[in-house]
């Protein structure tokens, strides 16, 4: 469950601009603020089932966006490459402060 929550948080971060305000609100409350379905339903004066259905549809949409655009996949790949680069530089060029600063700057872009 934690893995799914983390994935949804990342997908939400990347694709939230493509969601409707209602979808954004439900997802933020459920995944970021850890509200229960019942709490969200009460806040919006809808049924728990309506909230559940909306969240599941939104999750499916986020997965479709990722399948087509691959922003999370590319982000994770960049993170892996940067970690390898940092490791290599620290082993081979540990005393090169300028190179270390450039890699740090690159790392902070994500």
Curated annotation (Swiss-Prot):
Pfam families: UPF0122
SUPFAM superfamilies named in the record: Sigma3 and sigma4 domains of RNA polymerase sigma factors
Family that this chain belongs to: Belongs to the UPF0122 family.
Function: Might take part in the signal recognition particle (SRP) pathway. This is inferred from the conservation of its genetic proximity to ftsY/ffh. May be a regulatory protein.
Name listed for the protein in its UniProt record: UPF0122 protein GK1195
